[in-house]
Amino acid sequence: MAANKNSTSDAAALGWAPMKLTTWNVNGIRASLNKGLREYLFDSGADVICLQETKAMQEQVDLTFFGGYQAVWNSAEKKGYSGTCILSRVPWLSHEIGMGSADHDREGRVITTEFAEFYVVTVYTPNSQAELARLPYRLQWDDVFRAFIKRLERKKPVLVCGDLNVAHQEIDLANPKSNRMNPGFSDEERDSFTRHLDAGFLDVFREFDQSPGRYTWWTQRTPDARMKNIGWRLDYWLASGALRPALKSCTIRDDVHGSDHCPVELMIG
């Protein structure tokens, strides 16, 4: 079933104003501010901006760049590693750091903000690493995360965004055959993502766009990978099924530079 693209009356019917939200793995927030993030903050017009792989503590970042936005940070215990941040021009009702799991909350990977209509959860899913060395941990982490967002959903609908570190289907990467069983395209990781969908969450981009060649990450190990669009779709918006009537668009902004990933924008309401 395609998402509802008739936006003329949905916001009024739902009783809340439209919102623009964006997610971006910035691969180091301090470096990305000088490579395109600063301009994107000013130009995007987003109400909520979710960032992953910030690689910084809050006190290491000049917060004047975020004028007009309130911010919540979740930094890894290990300096210069992982980390997430949510910026919002819309006041939130509450926020939560992590998932409440001592085994999975040391790397700064999850932030939840509660708004009147829904939760927004940003996530930086662990990479399974070379030779799938961290795959068992990754799969356990996925299960804990799925249970966490399902608990939130008991109260109100949930939007999940971020770098989920998986290309779900062959259409989601340029070279599926040569990458079979590599980190991010193992059968186990793909099946785990399918369980998110089986739990009732929508892959919002694919609700609107079923075309190939739509990627959000390009390896820096191959200098011309982005120019040739040899990429992977690793960055997602997931939505509770109850939000389907409010989903208006989901856009991969591969024209925006500043990281090895690009932003993915969501319009809702």
Model-derived segments and spans:
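Active-site beta-strand/loop signature of hydrolases that rely on acidic residues for catalysis
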Residues: 25, 41-59, 120, 149-170, ...
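N-terminal, active-site-proximal structural segment of metallo-dependent hydrolase catalytic domains
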Residues: 2-65, 76-81, 97
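Surface-exposed cleft-lining segments at the edges of enzyme active sites
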Residues: 100-101, 126-142, 177-181
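Active-site-proximal beta-strand elements of phosphoester/diester hydrolases
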Residues: 19-27, 117-129, 161
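Metal-dependent phosphoesterases centered on the DNase I-like endonuclease/exonuclease/phosphatase
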Residues: 48, 68-70, 141-230, 234
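Structured beta-strand-rich core segments of catalytic domains in phosphoester-bond hydrolases
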Residues: 55, 60-128
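Surface polyanion/phosphate-binding segment centered on an Asp-His-Pro turn
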Residues: 251-269
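Conserved beta strand-loop-helix elements of the APE1-like EEP
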Residues: 79-94, 222-245
